[in-house]
């Protein structure tokens, strides 16, 4: 037996929201009685915020990737330096043992 999930938006009293009015400049506002409750964003403002947020996220991802590769590079440099230092210590200790004999 198939089950269906309702895709309808949740129900709540519209009266709590107030009435939506748009002024001559195209700015939407929500009024409740005579008091201004909340400024409703226009489509342009919504798109602007979405674009800004997207650019902000991309910027942070790029910085994280750059720092990650920089950390990887430093890690590789440390590995190389450690191996060179270990080889140096091995050579030095082998020379010391050869001289002692």
From Swiss-Prot:
Major place of residence: membrane
Protein's UniProt name: Small integral membrane protein 21
Membrane topology: Single-pass membrane protein
Organism name: Homo sapiens (Human)
Transmembrane segments: 49-65
Compartment list: Membrane
Gene encoding the protein: SMIM21
Superkingdom in the source lineage: Eukaryota
Keywords noted in UniProt: Membrane, Transmembrane, Transmembrane helix
GO cellular component: membrane
């Amino acid at each position: 037996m198939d089950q269906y999930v309702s895709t309808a938006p949740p129900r709540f009293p519209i009266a709590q929201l107030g009435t939506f009015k748009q002024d001559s400049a195209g700015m939407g506002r929500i009024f409740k009685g005579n008091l201004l409750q909340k400024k409703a964003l226009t489509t342009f403002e919504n798109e602007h915020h979405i674009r800004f947020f997207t650019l902000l996220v991309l910027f942070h991802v790029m910085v994280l990737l750059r720092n990650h590769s920089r950390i990887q590079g430093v890690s590789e440099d440390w590995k190389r330096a450690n191996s060179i230092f270990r080889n140096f210590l091995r050579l030095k200790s082998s020379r010391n043992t050869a001289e002692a004999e």
